[in-house]
Structure formats: structure tokens, C-alpha cells
Amino acid sequence: MDYILRILPNMFAGLGVSAQIFLITIVLSLPIGILLALVRISKVAVFRKLAEIYIYVMRGTPLMLQIMFIYYGLPLMLNVQISDFLAAILAFVANYAAYFAEIFRGGIQSIPKGQYEGAKVLGFTYRQTMWHIVLPQVVKRVIPPLGNETITLLKDTSLVYILAMNDLMRVTRAFVQRDFDTMPFLVAAVFYLVCTAILTKILTYVEKRYAVYEE
């Protein structure tokens, strides 16, 4: 118990780094995902194809590879310096925006075409139809799959240890290697499980709230 109490401050600090990456990724990737989804169903073939290729590449390659490419590859190609934190954010946002885009695309395409036609008769523009009629319904429908991806994101933040960032996973590995003790792994597991439980509760609450409004 004394050992756990000694490592807890560092573990909490590592959790803070992981939480920053998680929150920033959510805040940025959700709106980008919506925009990508709209481009993906656009009537402009060039834009639609570009969005399709982007989503295919992001979903078809490992997130770890994307992190390493942005951190090591982009500086060589563009002759710029990228911090480990910025590289992690860019990689996570680029990756999860693609996944969110496909979720939103499926939600948008599930809306009956009659609603678009009805909105047009009422004088709504395409933008107004999307904003006031389609997207509010889409949000209700995509909460479960978005929740699943959000929980996956929480666990994926552990991948940033390859950038030598002091996230929860790297701090844990450092203690294990230094002290030859596996207890930090158990503590880290508890941290992730508690965070996942809290996130699941929040998502369940949001889903129920939308269900009430739907009724």
C-alpha cells in the first residue's frame, strides 16, 4: 500500500496528460467529422472522392503508424519541428475525425428523403435543412456508435507512449522497469476502468436524455 501511495502522484500526472489528449481530440474531431461526412455525401464528385480517399487511408492504416509518421515523417518532409504533444493531437484528430465522419454519414443517409423534400417545399435551403432538421435527428441516432468510438479513444491514448510523452502508460512502464514490480500495471488498469465507467455513465445519461426528448 505504501508503494501505491508513493507512485499515485506520478500516475495522476500521467492520467492528466492522457485526459488532455482525449478531450482535445473529442472537441476537434467531432465537428471535423461532421464536415467530412457532409463532403462525403456532397454532389461535387471531386470533393466526395477526396473525402472518401482520406477516410479510407485514415481507417485503413494503424493509428500508431500515423502518430509516428506525423512526429518523424512530417518534420523531414516539411523541414519543421513538431512537438510530441502536437504530433499526438494531429494524429488522433485526423484518425478519429475519419471514424466519426463515417458514423455521421450513416446517420445522415438514414434520414428519409421525404424530409428533405418537405423542407424544400417549406422554403428551407440545403444548409437550413441540414442544421435544423437533419442533424438534430442524426445526433440522436449516432450516440451509441459515437460512444463506442469515444471509449476506444480513451484506451488508444496509451499509444502516445511511443513519443516518450509522460502519459499514464509511459509513467506506468517507467515504474515497472525501475522497480521490477507489476503493481503499477494493476494501478493503471484501475485508472482506465474507472475512467471508462465514468464515460459510460455519461454516455448512457446523454442517450437517455435524447430518448426522453424523442418521446
Give the location of each predicted region.
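Transmembrane alpha-helices and adjacent helix-loop boundaries
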Residues: 1-215
